[in-house]
Every structure is written in structure tokens, then in C-alpha cells.
Amino acid sequence: MPIKSRIRTIPDYPKKGIMFRDITTLLKDPVGFRLVIDQITQHYLENGINFDMIIGMEARGFIIGGALSYTLGKGFVPIRKPGKLPGETVNQEYQLEYGTDKVEMHIDALEKGTRVLLVDDLLATGGTALAGAALIEKVGGVVADMAFIVNLPDIGGQKKLEEKGYSLFSLTEFEGD
């Protein structure tokens, strides 16, 4: 059973007209979760994409990023919602469909020039990933690549990231959503 078939689709959530791709059904399946981690790990080992650290976006990026840090032997740094980190932080505002939001990370999370794999569960508009990349660059890091379980290419995030010069990998896509 492939990864895509383990992802539940919930129509009209969080609002009418949205087809929500719920990865919790994939994560609760031990075989599915192992497939995700094994396939992303294999991709980075086989393709020689070099990075020093894995950074995960709150919250599901923590689940994937933490497991990848273990399998790839890299450290892990979280990017969190404001007010969740105890040390000095730097933040980045980004656009939502209706309004803005912020994410932050510790200002001393990376040494200058650290190459990073940015991880999140799903790529839609690209706003969260761009905010994460901006934070990494603010503290002196370099985004080596981005990894997602799901890409929704018709929403435009992949195109937006690639136009900004970022490369990415995703395990599966849902088109037309």
C-alpha cells in the first residue's frame, strides 16, 4: 500500500471547498510512517545532497524531522510559533489566506554557513516554507534543500519556492486541489 493511499482526505475542512490532506492516518500506521522516513532518508543518502542540520516546522515537521535526524545522524532544530522557545529568538512574519502569522527560532540555533534540510509535512502555498527559509538565512544558515511528505502543486508553493532558488523533494502529490 503506497504512502498516498494512507493519507485521509477530509472534504470542506477547515472551510468549504478545501480538500484537507490529513497525514495523521499515515503517521499512526507504523508501516506507513516507516515508509515515509525510509524513503526520505534513502533520497538524501542516494542523491548526495549535503547538509549539516535538519530543521522542522511546527508541528508535524517535528515528527518527520526528528525521525530523519536520527536516521541521517544530524542534529535537529525546531521552528516554532511565537512564545514557545525559552532563549533569545528571531522571528519571521508570513502571509496567511486571511491575515498574517509568525514563526521563530533561537538566534543561536545555527553557526554561520550551516547547511540545512528544512522539513514540513505538506507544501501548499509555500508561505510557511519561505518563512522558515528566511529565518534560517537570518541566523546565517543556508537552505540546502526542503523535504515534504505531500506537495499540492496546483496551489503554487513549489513554483514559488523554485522561483526563489530553493530545491525541494516530496514523496507524493495531490493534483487539482
Swiss-Prot record:
MF GO annotations: adenine binding; adenine phosphoribosyltransferase activity; AMP binding
Catalytic activity: AMP + diphosphate = 5-phospho-alpha-D-ribose 1-diphosphate + adenine
Keyword Hydrolase in record: no
GO cellular component terms, semicolon-separated: cytoplasm
Disulfide bridge map: none
Biochemical pathway: Purine metabolism; AMP biosynthesis via salvage pathway; AMP from adenine: step 1/1
Gene3D superfamilies: 3.40.50.2020
Function noted in UniProt: Catalyzes a salvage reaction resulting in the formation of AMP, that is energically less costly than de novo synthesis.
Oligomeric form and interacting partners: Homodimer.
Protein's name in the database: Adenine phosphoribosyltransferase
Organism whose genome encodes this protein: Prosthecochloris aestuarii (strain DSM 271 / SK 413)
Gene designation per UniProt: apt
